Amino acid sequence: MKREVFLQKVRQQLGRVADSPVATPPRFRVEARPFSVDPDSLQQLFLDRQSQLDVAVTLACSRSDAQMAVEELLKERKWRISCALDVRWAGIAGCWTDSAAEADFGLCVAEWAIAETGSVVLVLAGTHTRGASLLPPAVGFFVAKSRLVARLGDVLHFLDADGGLPTCVTMVTGPSASADIVGVRTVGVHGPSQVRVYIIENE
């Protein structure tokens, strides 16, 4: 199919004509700014980013409080759960499934959280596979407040100190979102449409 024929079909579907003016992209001014290393300041910046990304955040004093918050959510929504957690987190009550593709909620432990972007960082390991963070329609991440960092560069520094990049590093920044050829944003097509983060104070 010729390019113009294809574009004309797209225009017809959108109710547009060929000579419609193209919007000029906005110009953004990017300024480097110093970050505080104070944990409370990093947490507040991270919370601000999560609010912009439509991510629900729960502040938990302890690991057990975070687990109870998850259990309450599962009971309220009647969700089946699949997870990529190590043995430290065993004991969460709920309706479990071994198949992440059949679960309503996936649960993972994030190695770090990046305040600047609102991202959580997962590192692939034997007990941390990608399925639980990709396949269910909703996903939750446990992250310790002590693992909040300012920028991506801080994560790379820690990885380098640990011997370099592992097999897989995944960064999750809000719900999965994609856009089609005309920029229409769709949430949840290629991953979870709901994201929850549980920040644990004393971990």
Locate each region found by the language model.
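The feature marks the mature, well-folded catalytic cores of soluble enzymes
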Residues: 1-203
